[in-house]
């Protein structure tokens, strides 16, 4: 399963670790992903999404029905 937020589309990004001597070694910054069950009142069922914490805040703001409608238009499975 890829490390991508289903709501925001956040993906891992690359950067550098920096030692005290400022040596650079490549590393990945991973999104803060969680598999979370959301209750969808209109469908009377739970939906499991793999979302970042930012994605959870978006769901709190817009509502789960609006977010699921966006996912459907993108053709994403949930």
Curated annotation (Swiss-Prot):
Q: What is this protein called?
A: Large ribosomal subunit protein bL28
Family, according to the entry, reads as follows: Belongs to the bacterial ribosomal protein bL28 family.
UniProt organism field: Photorhabdus laumondii subsp. laumondii (strain DSM 15139 / CIP 105565 / TT01)
> One matching Pfam family, short form?
Ribosomal_L28
What's any GO biological process attached to this entry? translation
Name the domain of life.
Answer: Bacteria
Of the GO CC terms on this record, one is: cytosolic large ribosomal subunit
| Membrane-spanning intervals of the chain | none
Q: Where is the signal peptide?
A: none
Matching InterPro entries: Ribosomal_bL28, Ribosomal_bL28/bL31-like_sf, Ribosomal_bL28_bact-type, Ribosomal_bL28_sf
Arranged from A to Z, the UniProt key words for this protein are:
Ribonucleoprotein, Ribosomal protein
**Sample GO molecular function, one term:** structural constituent of ribosome
HAMAP family, sorted:
Ribosomal_bL28
Looking at the keywords, is Transmembrane present? no
- Which NCBIfam families does the UniProt entry name for this protein? L28
- Region of interest: Disordered: 1-21
């Amino acid at each position: 399963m890829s490390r991508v937020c289903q709501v925001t589309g956040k993906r891992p990004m690359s950067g550098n670790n920096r030692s005290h001597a400022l040596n650079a070694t490549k590393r990945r910054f991973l999104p803060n992903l969680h598999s979370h069950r959301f209750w969808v009142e209109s469908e009377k069922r739970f939906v499991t999404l793999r979302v970042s914490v930012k994605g959870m805040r978006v769901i709190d703001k817009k509502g789960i029905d609006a977010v699921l409608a966006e996912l459907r238009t993108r053709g994403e499975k949930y």
